[in-house]
Design a protein with these regions (language model features):
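Low-complexity, glycine/alanine/valine/leucine- and proline-rich hydrophobic stretches
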Residues: 148-157, 164, 178-187
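Short, solvent-exposed coil/turn linker segments
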Residues: 42, 50, 148, 165-168, ...
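Short, charged alpha-helical interaction segments and adjacent helix-coil junctions
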Residues: 2-7, 16, 77-82, 174, ...
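Generic structural signal for hydrophobic core residues of well-folded globular domains
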Residues: 25, 38, 123, 167, ...
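Accessory alpha/beta interaction modules
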Residues: 1-161, 170-172
Length: 282
């Protein structure tokens, strides 16, 4: 972990960094442009919604998103950043979008005509392929929708998914020709910079980096970020040490398994030794 004086830019792939850049900056175009590029849309504006979505009944569990936003005409976007591999992350994405669709249901007479829901996953691990033989090692953005199996005709435009393999992205800066590639490159490499790099002639990335600059944050924000990163590395080191010695900590294993099952960090913290903050850092 870097010393405070050595941090130039925050990591956009950790919870604090992602929300600082995309959610708290007030610069909604920083998330609008990636959504437009990845999903082929033409969004002009979005409203950032409450990240926690309660169940429709007392018995249903709540869903908490990293970011939830909507357009004026009701298109919904769920954005999730995931650092630790989860066996059922795809299923979790389906659960989140299904919950969002359920909340669009109207009382009284309703003909099931709801506005589209989009899910964007930013991953620090390799995507799991149900059909590995079809996987393209040079593909880092994976898009899914509802289609007919044989002809690939679209069944509906109401539900779409995109998963970005940030950690696996291995293109050099000079190889990044599209906005999507450049976005992936900056998301992965930003916290490694020791000096401001020469980037593409695009004001988007200038604003992105300005918002992510560690020196631009208040002292309180800097301390929160350092605490977040320390917890992340401490917990990672604990897991690495336990695995290397063949003595994996039972509480850590339990927490990871519960994350894979889709339990929230709050629920896991009540049942295991790791704190809620440590669990969120996974």
């Amino acid at each position: 972990m870097k010393n405070k004086q050595d941090i130039l830019y925050i990591d956009p792939m950790v919870d604090f960094g992602f929300k600082k850049i995309f959610k708290e900056s007030g610069k909604k175009h920083l998330i609008i442009r990636p959504l437009n590029a990845i999903f082929g849309l033409d969004i002009a504006d979005i409203d950032i919604r409450e990240s926690e979505q309660l169940g429709l009944t007392d018995q249903e569990r709540k869903a908490t998103f990293d970011m939830h936003c909507e357009t004026k005409d009701g298109h919904s976007f769920i954005i999730e950043v995931q650092l630790a591999d989860q066996t059922f992350f795809m299923e979790r994405a389906i659960f989140y979008t299904s919950r969002t669709i359920s909340h669009k249901a109207q009382s009284g007479d309703w003909n099931y005509d709801f506005k589209p829901v989009f899910f964007l996953g930013l991953l620090n691990f390799d995507i799991r392929h149900l059909e590995p033989e079809k996987a393209n090692p040079d593909q880092f953005i994976h898009k899914f929708s509802l289609r007919e199996d044989m002809t690939h005709e679209q069944m509906s435009r109401a539900l779409r998914f995109a998963f970005l393999e940030v950690e696996r992205f291995d293109k050099a800066k000079e190889e990044c020709e599209t906005f999507e590639d450049r976005f992936l490159w900056i998301m992965k490499n930003l916290p490694t910079f020791v000096e401001k790099p020469e980037l593409w002639e695009d004001p988007y990335f200038d604003e992105f980096m300005e918002q992510a600059e560690f020196a631009n944050m208040s002292w309180e924000e800097q301390e929160r970020y350092i605490a977040t990163m320390k917890q992340r590395w401490d917990f990672k080191n604990t897991i690495d040490f336990a695995e290397a010695k063949g003595e994996a900590n039972r509480a850590v294993k339990t927490a990871l398994k519960m994350l894979e099952k889709g339990f929230s960090p709050e629920d896991i913290a009540e049942c295991t030794d790791p704190t809620e903050e440590q669990i969120k850092a996974l």
